[in-house]
Amino acid sequence: CIPIDPFYLTYKARSVDYHTRLIELAGEINDYMPEYVTARLQDLLNDERKPLKGSKVILLGIAYKGDIDDIRQSPALKVWDQLEAKGADVTYFDPYCRSVKRNDKIYESCTLGEDLLKNADAVVVTCAHTKGVDYNLVLEASPLILDTKNVISKVTDVDLKSCPKLHLL
């Protein structure tokens, strides 16, 4: 796994006076991605004349990677924190993570339905689950989608050029 295992390699390499700068740079880029996702979403909302503050944002998938329930080291949680810090109203849907404890509070995965999606200002795909998510419904009902995993175009028949509400990272 990119975020963790290579740093062990870096640690061991240093013990024999070998430097792994490329791995360290990749780690820095990975660490910055939640900030980039937040800024990108803010720009997309601004294009729709909506501020991030007060916007209803659904995080689609909060697990560390697709089709698991492990949230440890999940970048989605960092995105969640940054969105909330900027005043967004954040909810999440994850078919594998039905509830999560964060900051001494229990959060429940919402039910992914047409009304929820239509009433959101944006959906951010932060995990590429292949089961348990109706991506066609997400595509049809959401007003704005930021797909950080490029999963929607892989599992639907969407033509990216003719779908202005779908944005890839």
Model-derived features with residue positions:
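Structural/interface elements that position substrates and couple domains in central-metabolism enzymes
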Residues: 1-169
